[in-house]
Amino acid sequence: VKDLCLEPQLFSLLEGKVKYLAATPRFKDVIQTFAVPAGETPAGFRIESTLQEDGLLLIDLVRDISYDKNGVKRPTGILYSADSANPYEVAPIAPLLANLTCNPGIVYDLFINNPKANVGNAFHTRDEVMTELGRILGPGCDISVELNNPFEEDFDKILEECETFKSILSEYRLVVKVPHTGPVNPNNVHELLEGDKKLSTRYDQASTADALRGHNLALRLREHGYRINYTLMFEPYQTAMALQAKPYFINSFVRHRAKQSSA
């Protein structure tokens, strides 16, 4: 942090008051986690400073994907996200992304089990794919990974899955993707995978518990320190309720609903 440049206004405020300079434990952890070259701070973090009463100026790194490396803002206020789990597809656009999202269908059906995409069958597990995506995207891009089974009754198993994500991507990049479940529940989810793949329960016939299953799961995971990407909503009005689950991101597939309505 000794080479950190301060804005003139901040320098004027601190001049004569700072006796010591130090980095926070999080600052050090970020640098070590991403093996940042000397003299740099990584993309995806803004630099914050706090002056203590004893004259100690603490320098911290706070997660913020609107920042490029060395505390410089990205060129525009629009942040780009991609929906893919194909490392070969992601690599060319990686420097331009602030977020990546994927779900089990994208990971397994469109990539791992697709010989045209998974060239030479190089990848066999989701963990291998996530590791490679993390390497390609670097520290500046959040990665939203959807739970394999949001209907899992054992919450400890869901936490175990999230811990695996965190060990691969780090707590700084991981965003857990939780779907709005609507009328789908553990007893009828198989209908979406069998036969005509249509659900026998209408969207407006969901029980209260089923309709809010995703919301409550998102809240529980947030209480355990995870950032949440709340997804799979098709109506604008659903966003207001989703905000009650305190997500980090919201994915509303309004375009799908609009297309269906105009068909």
Residue ranges of predicted features:
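Long, compositionally biased, glycine/small-hydrophobic-enriched stretches that function as flexible linkers
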Residues: 1-77
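Generic structural signal for short, flexible, solvent-exposed coil/loop and linker residues
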Residues: 69-71, 89, 95-96, 239
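Active-site glycine- and acidic-residue-rich loops that bind
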Residues: 81, 153-156, 225-234
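Active-site beta->alpha loop and helix N-cap motifs at the rims of alpha/beta catalytic domains
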Residues: 45-61, 76, 81-212
